[in-house]
Regions:
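SAM-dependent Rossmann-like transferase core, predominantly class I methyltransferases
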Residues: 1-17
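Conserved class I S-adenosyl-L-methionine
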Residues: 17-28
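Conserved SAM-binding loop of SAM-dependent methyltransferases across substrates and taxa
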Residues: 29-41
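Conserved SAM-binding motif I beta-strand of class I
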Residues: 42-47
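S-adenosyl-L-methionine
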Residues: 49-95
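Mobile active-site "lid"/loop adjacent to the S-adenosyl-L-methionine
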Residues: 50-52, 74-78, 91-122
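Short glycine-dipeptide loop
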Residues: 122, 127-134
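C-terminal catalytic and target-recognition region of SAM-dependent MTase-like enzymes
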Residues: 131-190
């Protein structure tokens, strides 16, 4: 269902005539990372699950692009971004697919509806002076595409201009031709 976003990111990267750094937070099995690597970007892939990061590495190897520039990191995404801010590292694009709910190693509770604003605000601080895109995916019931679009618009358009869009994402059912809704996406782009 997220292939539309992978294609969007790859196209934006290919059309830009400069080296690009992309941050993929909550990167799971790495499909977005691979799309960006294949398009020519340097990618930083972050996920808290060691197994998911290993799977993403295997997907890169199976795709024949394991030699492309990428950092594979097993880390808490929020803590990683906080360190990147202190280090002064910047990215030209951010892709994030945060979970709806989770618990940290210390029992901390993560609820996307309560922490999305602060997460995007934090991530905004690692965007370069000339960012290309910010892609936000969600499978959280009750977090509509319109709310996600508004959030990106409020937090990013004032400083970076550009435009914001949102949509439901889903999978087309071959038997019926209907689309099975799977989640929401919002995109800020230059």
């Amino acid at each position: 269902e997220q292939a539309v976003n992978w294609d969007f990111a790859a196209e934006k990267i290919k059309n830009e005539n400069r080296p690009l750094k992309i941050l993929n937070l909550f990167g799971y099995t790495g499909c977005a990372t691979l799309a960006c690597m294949n398009a020519g970007a340097t990618v930083c892939h972050v996920d808290a699950s060691k197994g998911m990061v290993q799977w993403a590495k295997e997907n890169a190897a199976s795709s024949g692009i394991a030699d492309r520039p990428v950092r594979w990191l097993v880390d808490d995404c929020v803590k990683f971004v906080q360190r990147e801010i202190r280090r002064g590292n910047r990215y030209d694009g951010i892709i994030m697919d945060p979970p709806s709910y989770g618990r940290g190693p210390g029992g901390e509770v993560w609820k996307l509806e309560e922490q999305l604003y602060s997460l995007v605000t934090l991530c905004k601080q690692v965007l370069s002076d000339n960012p290309l895109f910010f892609i936000l995916n969600s499978y959280t019931t009750g977090l509509s595409p319109a709310v996600m679009e508004y959030l990106l618009g409020v937090l990013l358009q004032k400083d970076f201009g550009g435009k914001v869009s949102s949509d439901e994402i889903g999978l087309k059912v071959s038997d019926t031709g209907l689309v099975l809704p799977c989640g929401s996406t919002a995109i800020w782009e230059k």
